[in-house]
From Swiss-Prot:
It comes from Prochlorococcus marinus (strain MIT 9313). It is found in: Cytoplasm. This is Ribose-phosphate pyrophosphokinase. It comes from the Bacteria. Keywords: ATP-binding, Cytoplasm, Kinase, Magnesium, Metal-binding, Nucleotide biosynthesis, Nucleotide-binding, Transferase. GO terms for cellular component: cytoplasm; ribose phosphate diphosphokinase complex. The active site is at K211. Its EC number is 2.7.6.1. D-ribose 5-phosphate binds at R213, D237, D241, T242, G243, G244, T245. Homohexamer. Mg(2+) 2 binds at D187.
Amino acid sequence: MTSFLTAARTEQESISYDMQRLRLFSGTSNPALAREIAAYLGVPDGPRICKRFADGELYVQIQESIRGCDVFLIQPTCAPVNDNLMELLIMVDACQRASARQITAVVPYYGYARADRKTAGRESITAKLTANLLVKSGVNRVLAMDLHSAQIQGYFDIPCDHIYGSPVLVDYLAAQELNEVVVVSPDVGGVARARAFAKQMRDAPLAIIDKRRSGHNVAESLTVIGDVAGKTAILIDDMIDTGGTICSGARLLRQQGAKRVIACASHAVFSPPACERLSEEGLFEQVLVTNSIPIAAERHFPQLQVLSVANMLGEAIWRIHEESSVSSMFRG
């Protein structure tokens, strides 16, 4: 499997392509990630104006010609989710009206993903609604990372490339030469994700926390299925929101004799009081997340390690532009 911790594409790997036809533009939700992606590809983060009027309306202008170009718009729809989603839709519309040949929405974090099905009467399936909005706005393709559930990929009536942040997390953990590792799913719904992660961790054993949720953002851990005593437990999830699920799981693992606990997640949503919970002394040895969502400096804590997925996203963008395989990035 390709390592995505290298600085940039090497000269030997950089197959010649039409630089004038590949254009990157970032919204305002994560410009730092966009700059890293641009550096990996060796192309500029294109000039644009994104601003807000006094009444709260958003304005976007692309400040160079993109007629006939292959345009990639980098915008995770994290908090403030409604503003960032609307900004992305306006960017797409601006590019479409500027005669871009193809528009790809690069959405490292896909907001509203947890509303992927009806769990009660008269609810909206907002993950599908968001997909519809992107398609209707004029997007030709979506590049997303670690969607909350795999079926969301099928909500799009256009191509959707779904990539995973796990290789970046696995590369980091492999460099630490951990012994006696067990990969733990914080709930039954995450078993497939944890099993895939365990396979990448040299077929590490798997454990599951059986949990019942009593309300939104409230979770109760009941029992551990599997042996964690004396081992390094790696708790893996797609996102950490308030931290309730993963922290209650970590406490249970400690009670069951885990030597140390490491939390891994692609998306650091970190809604309050997540940072206070995650930084609790003696709970986690490390909390590993990616930079799919920007994390303000005041929300950092000693156990936190933020790993960049810029190279991986940049590689996927390059392959889409070159019409080569994206899925092969994650084979072998």
